[in-house]
Structures are given as structure tokens and as C-alpha cells.
């Protein structure tokens, strides 16, 4: 190549190893990583969950969707477990 590229990066023309080239560029680089990135997402997550009610909106009257109480959920889950149990026993006897 006749001279340095306008962007200042040399791709494949350097005699140095890539790790040394990256280390040399990183040492003099003006681009910095944001230090408050993790704190910002945590505080943003906290404010959004506190502002909208978070999980508690699931149990309020204004939440969209089907309203099912805890007793029907318990009954349906026990019926599902019983049905799986009966199918398991029925499959054992019809197989042998």
C-alpha cells in the first residue's frame, strides 16, 4: 500500500500480530466504554416495575385477559395430574 489509509486502520498489511495491534490501538483510543450502563438498566428496570405495578398488575381488575381464581386453577391442575396418571396406568395394561 502506498500510504496509510484515510480511516487509520490497516487491514492485513501490518507485520505485527493482531493481538498486539489491537492492544496498541486500544491504548491510544479515544472511545470509552460507558461505565454506568449496568447501573442504568438496573435503575430503569426498578422504576418501570415500580411505576406500572410490576407483577401486581397481574392480579388487578384493570389487567387484560381471563380472570381465573386460585381454586379453579388448583382443581384443573389436579384433574390434569389425575388424567396423566390414568393414561399412564392405561398404557401399561394395554401394552402387556
Swiss-Prot record:
Positions of the UniProt region annotated as Disordered: 1-54
Composition-biased stretches (Low complexity): 40-50
Coiled-coil regions, chain positions: none
Subcellular location: Endoplasmic reticulum membrane
Residue ranges, compositional bias (Polar residues): 1-17
Domain of life: Eukaryota
One Gene Ontology biological process: retrograde protein transport, ER to cytosol
Principal cellular location given in the protein's record: endoplasmic reticulum
Keywords associated with the record: Acetylation, Endoplasmic reticulum, Lipoprotein, Membrane, Palmitate, Phosphoprotein, Protein transport, Translocation, Transmembrane, Transmembrane helix, Transport
Residues making up the signal peptide according to the UniProt record: none
Cytoplasmic domain ranges by topology: 2-70
GO cellular component, one term: membrane
PTM-bearing positions, type Phosphothreonine: 9
Bilayer disposition of the protein: Single-pass membrane protein
Molecular-function GO terms, alphabetical: epidermal growth factor binding; ribosome binding
Modified residues (N-acetylproline): 2
Lipidation (S-palmitoyl cysteine): 39
Quaternary structure annotation from Swiss-Prot or TrEMBL: The SEC61 channel-forming translocon complex consists of channel-forming core components SEC61A1, SEC61B and SEC61G and different auxiliary components such as SEC62 and SEC63. The SEC61 channel associates with the multi-pass translocon (MPT) complex. Interacts with TRAM1.
Job of this protein: Component of SEC61 channel-forming translocon complex that mediates transport of signal peptide-containing precursor polypeptides across the endoplasmic reticulum (ER). Forms a ribosome receptor and a gated pore in the ER membrane, both functions required for cotranslational translocation of nascent polypeptides.
Family of this protein: Belongs to the SEC61-beta family.
Record protein name field: Protein transport protein Sec61 subunit beta
Species this chain originates from: Mus musculus (Mouse)
Amino acid at each position: 500500500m502506498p500510504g496509510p489509509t484515510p480511516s487509520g486502520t490497516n487491514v492485513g498489511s501490518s507485520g505485527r500480530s493482531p493481538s498486539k495491534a489491537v492492544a496498541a490501538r486500544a491504548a491510544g483510543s479515544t472511545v470509552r466504554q460507558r461505565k454506568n450502563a449496568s447501573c442504568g438498566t438496573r435503575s430503569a428496570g426498578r422504576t418501570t416495575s415500580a411505576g406500572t405495578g410490576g407483577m401486581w398488575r397481574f392480579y388487578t381488575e384493570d389487567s387484560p385477559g381471563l380472570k381465573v381464581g386460585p381454586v379453579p386453577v388448583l382443581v384443573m391442575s389436579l384433574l390434569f395430574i389425575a388424567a396423566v396418571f390414568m393414561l399412564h396406568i392405561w398404557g401399561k395394561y394395554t401394552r402387556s
